[in-house]
């Protein structure tokens, strides 16, 4: 009989607990439910606005990336040939020296002149131009490299006296400075 009492007592406890649960889960009033839904809607609206803002930022980043890549491609096309041109310049210098030091006018000298002219013409098509540095030109460290100084009464101080080696530009960007001597006061 004790066992029956004990079982019935446990059964009563379970019944009380289930009634408490039922009491807790009573239906919410319509006004409270509407308020909850409005709050949830407002939260989702904020989340949506944040996601839209994030989307716009990512899209702008992508557009900036595309522009940067396009600019880099243009730079590569414009200056990508720089290495090979720098390697060709010493051969160009040697052709000029050969013409300058030729003792006679011969077919070989004329052939070297023609070769030099063709090479300069081809380089010009790719945007290569010599740095114009006649004697008397003011020394410009952006385009000239001073190899020495010479006292001169004939020339203004800080002007080019002689050019040892021509300088070259590639699309207005310096490839190699002109090697020059510079006048100083006598």
Swiss-Prot record:
It is found in: Cytoplasm. GO terms for cellular component: cytosol. Pfam families: GrpE (PF01025). Keywords: Chaperone, Cytoplasm, Stress response. It comes from the Bacteria. The keyword DNA-binding does not apply. The keyword Chaperone applies. One of its GO terms (molecular function) is unfolded protein binding. Gene3D superfamilies: 3.90.20.20, Head domain of nucleotide exchange factor GrpE (2.30.22.10). One of its GO terms (biological process) is protein folding. Residues 1-29 are annotated as: Disordered. Residues 1-23 have a biased composition (Basic and acidic residues). Participates actively in the response to hyperosmotic and heat shock by preventing the aggregation of stress-denatured proteins, in association with DnaK and GrpE. It is the nucleotide exchange factor for DnaK and may function as a thermosensor. Unfolded proteins bind initially to DnaJ; upon interaction with the DnaJ-bound protein, DnaK hydrolyzes its bound ATP, resulting in the formation of a stable complex. GrpE releases ADP from DnaK; ATP binding to DnaK triggers the release of the substrate protein, thus completing the reaction cycle. HAMAP family: GrpE. Homodimer. Belongs to the GrpE family. This is Protein GrpE. The gene is grpE.
